[in-house]
Amino acid sequence: MERQNVQQQRGKDQRPQRPGASNPRRPNQR
């Protein structure tokens, strides 16, 4: 269960870190 929690936290951290990857509408921010 710890692995799942880590993966969820990573996905949340990756969203703000790489908004261009998850947000194709904001390619300018990348």
From Swiss-Prot:
Region of interest (Disordered), ranges: 1-30
Superkingdom assignment: Bacteria
Keyword DNA-binding: yes
Keywords: DNA-binding
A GO term, aspect molecular function: DNA binding
Function summary: Might be involved in DNA-binding; the protein binds DNA in gel-shift assays and immunogold electron microscopy shows labelling of condensed chromatin.
Miscellaneous field: The protein sequence was determined from Nine Mile phase II cells.
Name assigned to this protein: Protein ScvA
GN (gene name): scvA
